[in-house]
C-alpha cells in the first residue's frame, strides 16, 4: 500500500475498508494447497493471510507499527464475515477464523463498499430530499426496515389483515369523512406539532424542547409564511406599514442589480455606491431588534453548534448519522478487542496517530511557511489544556467585537479597564508614550500566533494582564451607546475613519458566551465553539516607528474557545478552524440547511421578508465582479458579513453574544439563502395528511388526536409457554385437517389416487373426526370394490385303478 495520509472527511472508515481490501486481494499470494488427499488451487491458509496482512498494516502509514497480530486476526474475521474471503468450501458470514492452516480463497464478487451518493437534485429541491422520510416520520420505523422472508412477510400479512378487518368493522364511521369539523385552534396545533416533529427528526434529538420551547412556535406566522409568497418565494405583506420603506427597497435594488439598475441619465458621482450602501446599512442597524429576533437567538446558534460538533454516540438515530473521528489512543488489551463488533470502529481504532505530525499539519494551516515559527507554535499548542486563560487581538477594522476572551479569574482584570456597554467588560485605555508607539504589546495565555518581520520588535507583557494592549491616542473617543444600536457594527464611514487614523485602535474585551444548556442525556455542557478569525491591523503610513516601516505585517488574531462534548472526549488544541473554513462539517451541511429552513418559518412575516431581501442583495453584491470596491482594504463579502451580522443575529443580553457565530451564520445564510428561505412543500403535505386523518373520524376527541395523531399498527403479542404449546398443536392439526379436506374434495384426483394419498398419512383422530361413521366414508367411496369371483373348482377325475 502506498504511504499516504489517513483519509479525511466523511465515510472515512469506508475509504479505509476499500483501500485495505483492494490491497489484500491484489497482493495476497495464492498457490496450491493439499487438504484431505485433495488439491486446491488459488487459495491460502489462515496463517499465510495473517502474516501477510500483519506486515501490510504495520508498513502502512495509516495504521503504523503498533498494530498487533490479534487485531489483524480480528480484521480477517471481518473479511470473512463480509465475504471478502471465504473458506475453501464457499462458506462465509461468520467469524470462524483462527491462526491455523484452514484454507481460504477469494470470491468472485468485489468486496468494495459503495459510498452514499448525493444527487444534484437534492441541492435544488427539498421535496426530493424528503421523498423517503416524509411519510416515514408518520410511520413506525421498523415497517420500513428489512425483515426476514419467513417472519417479516408473515407479520406484515397478519397486520394487514387486522387493519383491513378494523376498517371493515369501522366502515360506518368512515362513510361520511367530512362530518368531523376541525376548529382553527386544532389546525394551528397541527402546524405546531408537525414543524416541531420534523425539526426533531432532522436534528435527531430525543426532544426538541431542548432547543425550542413550544410556546415560541406561533402557527399563524408559519401559515402566513407558507401561503403568502411571490413567484420568487419572497413573503408578501398585507400590511404595508411593516414593509421596508420605498427608498430602502430602491437602494437595495440599485446595489443588487448594479450596474444594470444604474440609469446613465441620472447623475452619479464618485462614491455613489458607498453612500447607497451606507444608507441601507444604517436602516438595518437601527432596527429595534435583529431580523432573527431575540427569542430565537439560542435556537439558531445551537443548531450550528449541534450540527458542527456532534458525535456518533450522541446521534443514535435519525435520518442523518455521522461517523465519529476517534481521537483516543489505541488500546492493546486483548479483552477490549472483542468489543469491536463494528467493522468501522475496528478500522478507525487501527489508525496510526502521530501527534507531532498532527500538530505540525495544524500549524501549517494557521501560519505561513516559516519552519522555525511552526515548531515554536506547535510546542505552545501542547500547553492548551494546562492554561486556563486566553486572549485575542483587537479587530481594528470593524466596530464589532470578535474577540472571545475567557478569564478564569475575574480579578485578573486590571484597574485601567473602564466599563463601556453591557456587552463589553471593558476597554483598555492607557496613555501612549514614545516608547509604546514603537511597538505593540501582545500577550496570549493559550496560543500566541504572530508573524515577525526583521524590523519588528516584541515587548513582553506582564502576566497579570492577559489582554492585548493596542494603544490609542489620548484624544481617542469611546462612544457610549444605549439600546440595540450601541454595539452595532461600524458602517463604511466608520471603517474609513479607522483607516484614516481618526480612530487608531480600540480594545474590546468580553467574556465567552454559553451556547448550549446542559443536556440531560449527555450530563455535560456544550460550552463554546471552536473558531478562528484572521485580522489585518491598520498601520499608519506616516509613522516613523519600526512598525511603520513594516506596513505589510499581518497580525493574526486567534479567537478560540472549546466545546466540551463529553468528559471523556475532548477535541485537541490543534483542531481549530481557520478563518476560511466553514463552521459546519461537510457531511452535516444538509442537516443545517433543512433545520434552518424550518426555523426561518418561525419568524414573523415582516422579519422573514426583510431577511430574504437582505440575503438576496448581499449575495448578489458579493458575487458581482462589476461592483466597485466599497472599502479600500476589506473585500465586499467580508464587508457584508461584518456590517450586517449584528442586525441579523443578536441576543438580548449582549454579554452572551458570540459575534463570531453571528458572522458565521450570516456567511452560511449567504451561501445557501435560496434553499434556506424557500417554502418547504413537504411540510404542507404533511399537515394536510394529518388534518385529513382527523377529518375521517379516526380520532373522536381532538385533544386525543393531537397527542396521539398517528394510526396504530398491530404487532405480535407475547404469549406464555402454555399458550404457545396449545397454538402449536392446534395450528398443526388445523393444517392437517385442511390437507385432508383438499384431498377429499379434489376433483382432479381419481379414487385410486385419493386412497394412495390418504394411506400416506396416519392421523386417526383427525380422520375419525372427518369420517365419524362408515356411512360417511362410504359416501366418499361410493364405487364398491369388485370382489373377484373364486376360480371354479374342477373336480379331479377319479383314476380308475387298473387292477381289478
Curated annotation (Swiss-Prot):
SUPFAM superfamilies linked to this entry: GTPase activation domain, GAP (SSF48350), Winged helix' DNA-binding domain (SSF46785)
Kindly give the Pfam families that the UniProt entry links to this protein: DEP
Q: Which InterPro entries match?
A: DEP_dom, Rho_GTPase_activation_prot, WH-like_DNA-bd_sf, WH_DNA-bd_sf
Classify the main location: nucleus
Q: Which GO terms describe its biological process?
A: intracellular signal transduction; negative regulation of DNA-templated transcription
Q: What does this protein do?
A: May be involved in transcriptional regulation as a transcriptional corepressor. The DEPDC1A-ZNF224 complex may play a critical role in bladder carcinogenesis by repressing the transcription of the A20 gene, leading to transport of NF-KB protein into the nucleus, resulting in suppression of apoptosis of bladder cancer cells.
Protein name, as recorded: DEP domain-containing protein 1A
Natural source organism? Mus musculus
Amino acid at each position: 500500500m502506498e504511504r499516504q495520509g489517513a483519509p479525511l472527511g466523511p465515510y472515512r472508515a469506508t475509504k479505509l475498508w476499500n483501500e485495505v481490501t483492494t490491497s489484500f486481494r491484489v497482493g495476497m499470494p495464492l498457490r496450491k494447497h493439499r487438504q484431505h488427499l485433495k488439491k486446491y488451487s488459488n487459495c491460502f491458509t489462515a496463517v499465510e493471510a495473517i502474516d501477510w496482512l500483519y506486515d501490510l498494516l504495520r508498513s502502512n502509514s495509516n495504521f503504523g507499527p503498533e498494530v498487533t497480530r490479534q487485531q489483524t486476526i480480528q480484521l480477517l474475521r471481518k473479511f470473512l464475515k463480509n465475504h471478502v474471503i471465504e473458506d475453501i468450501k464457499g462458506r462465509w458470514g461468520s467469524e470462524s477464523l483462527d491462526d491455523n492452516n484452514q484454507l481460504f480463497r477469494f470470491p468472485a464478487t468485489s468486496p468494495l463498499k459503495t459510498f452514499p451518493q448525493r444527487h444534484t437534485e437534492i441541492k435544488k429541491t427539498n421535496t426530493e430530499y424528503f421523498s423517503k422520510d416524509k411519510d416515514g416520520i408518520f410511520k413506525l420505523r421498523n415497517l420500513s426496515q428489512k425483515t426476514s422472508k419467513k417472519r417479516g412477510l408473515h407479520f406484515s400479512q397478519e397486520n394487514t389483515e387486522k387493519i383491513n378487518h378494523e376498517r371493515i368493522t369501522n366502515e360506518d364511521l368512515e362513510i361520511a369523512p367530512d362530518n368531523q369539523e376541525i376548529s382553527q385552534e386544532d389546525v394551528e396545533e397541527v402546524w405546531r406539532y408537525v414543524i416541531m416533529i420534523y425539526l426533531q427528526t432532522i436534528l435527531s434529538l430525543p426532544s426538541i424542547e431542548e432547543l425550542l420551547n413550544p410556546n415560541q412556535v406561533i402557527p399563524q406566522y408559519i401559515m402566513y409564511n407558507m401561503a403568502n409568497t411571490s413567484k420568487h418565494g419572497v413573503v408578501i405583506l398585507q400590511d404595508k406599514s411593516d414593509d421596508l420603506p420605498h427608498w430602502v427597497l430602491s437602494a437595495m435594488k440599485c446595489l443588487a442589480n448594479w450596474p444594470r439598475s444604474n440609469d446613465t441619465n441620472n447623475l452619479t458621482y464618485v462614491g455613489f455606491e458607498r453612500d447607497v450602501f451606507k444608507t441601507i446599512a444604517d436602516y438595518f442597524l437601527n432596527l429595534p431588534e435583529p431580523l432573527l429576533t431575540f427569542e430565537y437567538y439560542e435556537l439558531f446558534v445551537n443548531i450550528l453548534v449541534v450540527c458542527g460538533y456532534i458525535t456518533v454516540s450522541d446521534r443514535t438515530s435519525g435520518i442523518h448519522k455521522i461517523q465519529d473521528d476517534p481521537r483516543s489512543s489505541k488500546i492493546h488489551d486483548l479483552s477490549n478487542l472483542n468489543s469491536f463488533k463494528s467493522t468501522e470502529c475496528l478500522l478507525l481504532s487501527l489508525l496510526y496517530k502521530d501527534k507531532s505530525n498532527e500538530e505540525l499539519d495544524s500549524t501549517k494551516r494557521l501560519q505561513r511557511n516559516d519552519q522555525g515559527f511552526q515548531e515554536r507554535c506547535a510546542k505552545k499548542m501542547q500547553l492548551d489544556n494546562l492554561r486556563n486563560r486566553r486572549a485575542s487581538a483587537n479587530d481594528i477594522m470593524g466596530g464589532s467585537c470578535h474577540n472571545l476572551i475567557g478569564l478564569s479569574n475575574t480579578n485578573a482584570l486590571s484597574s485601567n479597564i473602564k466599563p463601556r456597554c453591557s456587552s463589553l467588560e471593558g476597554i483598555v485605555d492607557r496613555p501612549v508614550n514614545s516608547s509604546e508607539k514603537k511597538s505593540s504589546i501582545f500577550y496570549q495565555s493559550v496560543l500566541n500566533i504572530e508573524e515577525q518581520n526583521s524590523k519588528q520588535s516584541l515587548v513582553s507583557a506582564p502576566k497579570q494582564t492577559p489582554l492585548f494592549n493596542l494603544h490609542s491616542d489620548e484624544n481617542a473617543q469611546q462612544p457610549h451607546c444605549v439600546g440595540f444600536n450601541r454595539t452595532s457594527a461600524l458602517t463604511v464611514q466608520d471603517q474609513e475613519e479607522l483607516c484614516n487614523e481618526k480612530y487608531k485602535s480600540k480594545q474590546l474585551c468580553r467574556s465567552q458566551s454559553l451556547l448550549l444548556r446542559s443536556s440531560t442525556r449527555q450530563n455535560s455542557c456544550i460550552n463554546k465553539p471552536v473558531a478562528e478569525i484572521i485580522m489585518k491591523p491598520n498601520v499608519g503610513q506616516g509613522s516613523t516607528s519600526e512598525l511603520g516601516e513594516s506596513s505589510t505585517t499581518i497580525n493574526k488574531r486567534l479567537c478560540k474557545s472549546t466545546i466540551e462534548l463529553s468528559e471523556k472526549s475532548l477535541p485537541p488544541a490543534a483542531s481549530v478552524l481557520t478563518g476560511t473554513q466553514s463552521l459546519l462539517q461537510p457531511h452535516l451541511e444538509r442537516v443545517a440547511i433543512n433545520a434552518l429552513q424550518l426555523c426561518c418559518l418561525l419568524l414573523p412575516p415582516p422579519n422573514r421578508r426583510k431577511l430574504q431581501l437582505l440575503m438576496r442583495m448581499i449575495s448578489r453584491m458579493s458575487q458581482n465582479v462589476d461592483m466597485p470596491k466599497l472599502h479600500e482594504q476589506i473585500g465586499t463579502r467580508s464587508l457584508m458579513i461584518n456590517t450586517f451580522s449584528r442586525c441579523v443575529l443578536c441576543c438580548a443580553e449582549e454579554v452572551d453574544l458570540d459575534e463570531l457565530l453571528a458572522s458565521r451564520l450570516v456567511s452560511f445564510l449567504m451561501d445557501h439563502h435560496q434553499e434556506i428561505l424557500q417554502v418547504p412543500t413537504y411540510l404542507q403535505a404533511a399537515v394536510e395528511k394529518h388534518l385529513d386523518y382527523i377529518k375521517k373520524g379516526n380520532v373522536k376527541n381532538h385533544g386525543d388526536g393531537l397527542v396521539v395523531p398517528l394510526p396504530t399498527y398491530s404487532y405480535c403479542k407475547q404469549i406464555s409457554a402454555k399458550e404457545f404449546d396449545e397454538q402449536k398443536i392446534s395450528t398443526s392439526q388445523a393444517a392437517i385437517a385442511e390437507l385432508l379436506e383438499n384431498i377429499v374434495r379434489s376433483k382432479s384426483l381419481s379414487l385410486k389416487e385419493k386412497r394412495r394419498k390418504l394411506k400416506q398419512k396416519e392421523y386417526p383422530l383427525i380422520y375419525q373426526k372427518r369420517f365419524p361413521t362408515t356411512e360417511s366414508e362410504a359416501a366418499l367411496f361410493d364405487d364398491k370394490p369388485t370382489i373377484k369371483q373364486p376360480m371354479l373348482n374342477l373336480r379331479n377325475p377319479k383314476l380308475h385303478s387298473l387292477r381289478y
